[in-house]
Amino acid sequence: MRQSKKLGQCFLKDKNFVKKAINRAELTDKDIVLEVGLGEGALTKELAKIAKKVYVIELDERLKPFADEITSEFENVEIIWSDALKVDLKTLGFNKIVANLPYQISSPITFKFLEEDFEVAVLMYQYEFAKRMAGKPDTKEYSRLSVAVQYNADVEFICKVPPSAFSPKPDVNSAIVKLTKREPKYHVKDEEFFKKVLKAIFQHRNRTIKRALIDSSHEIGIERNILKEILEKIENKFEFTERVFKTPPEKIGYLSNLLYDEI
């Protein structure tokens, strides 16, 4: 079958990386696992050998022959023919996620996952995306993505995966990442406003916090002149001269709360 470029299909073929992903998920026969992207079923089969139940969400119905082969062999596999971004995941009751994700939905599907109550997710991403997810302050990888994902999950970069592990070979390297869900380490008063602040400041990651906020005031829905007045009012409560890329997540959360109290 010819893979769909539109759907970002690169099927994982190398069993060593399949095993590595499964090992890091620490699966047991009590686990209910979600997989997004069936491929030719290499990962699905290995999941089904261990887990109590495997839900696979797949959009491309051309893969039905692979699905039929798997479901005839494993009674604990259920295929959901749909767009993963549109499925109500809360109805599935999974506690772990293991998937070779279609790269073009990496960001939206990750944030959709993080809204769910799971324990562990072991996921394949494009290498550069994975590095940014795990990014730390004062590094080139530190980004809006780093702060947003690490708000309620620990991110562990497992390993780099070469193009040769897939069919067809993608043009980029990939990586396996482990997300462990947890309660936030710091409090934000309004998560949607926090996301707006992240978007605003990381558009100018090399500038000072103050300059970045003013230049992207439209992102947080505050007129520039009003924002300047707010910043003057709270200037003794925050180090606004710090560069965005050096500011740790908890300080950004504190900043978000300061601004939220003033609007």
Swiss-Prot record:
Q: Which GO terms describe its molecular function?
A: RNA binding; rRNA (adenine-N6,N6-)-dimethyltransferase activity
Annotated positions binding S-adenosyl-L-methionine: L12, G37, E58, D83, N100
One GO cellular component term: cytoplasm
Do the record's keywords include RNA-binding?
yes
Q: Which Gene3D superfamilies match?
A: Ribosomal RNA adenine dimethylase-like, domain 2 (1.10.8.100), Vaccinia Virus protein VP39 (3.40.50.150)
| EC number, as in UniProt | 2.1.1.-
What InterPro entries does the entry give? KsgA/Erm, rRNA_Ade_diMease-like_C, rRNA_Ade_Mease_Trfase_CS, rRNA_Ade_methylase_Trfase_N, rRNA_adenine_dimethylase, SAM-dependent_MTases_sf
Q: Which CDD domains match?
A: AdoMet_MTases
Q: Where in the cell is it found?
A: Cytoplasm
Origin superkingdom = Archaea
Q: What is its main location?
A: cytoplasm
What biological function has been recorded for the protein in this entry? Specifically dimethylates two adjacent adenosines in the loop of a conserved hairpin near the 3'-end of 16S rRNA in the 30S particle. May play a critical role in biogenesis of 30S subunits.
Per its record, how is this protein called by name?
Probable ribosomal RNA small subunit methyltransferase A
Q: Which organism is it from?
A: Methanococcus maripaludis (strain C7 / ATCC BAA-1331)
* Gene that this polypeptide is encoded by: rsmA
